[in-house]
Amino acid sequence: MLPATSQKEQPIAEFTIRPRAPRAGQTIELFDASSDPDGVGVAWRVWDFGDGGTATGASPSHRYAQAGAYVITLTVATFDGRLASAKHAVAVREPGAR
């Protein structure tokens, strides 16, 4: 008989963006809402803004220089090395757009 192995659950990567429809040059704020069902905790976060910019931390901010469609990716890792990612598309409008 083989010994039982404990299967750990993957962390859940989640985040929100404010404002959801920014203008070029406007600062957006991101808020990590990730969790670890196993309770080990999130050790680090890496953000990729889709325009070459990156950040770490739970609540970074970012400015897109140009209007366009971008995908923001958050990757999180738990203290025991499990990874998860979440993606959100953001449509950055021209500075004068309503």
Residue spans for each PLM region:
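Extracellular/lumenal mature domains of secreted and surface-exposed proteins
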Residues: M1-R98
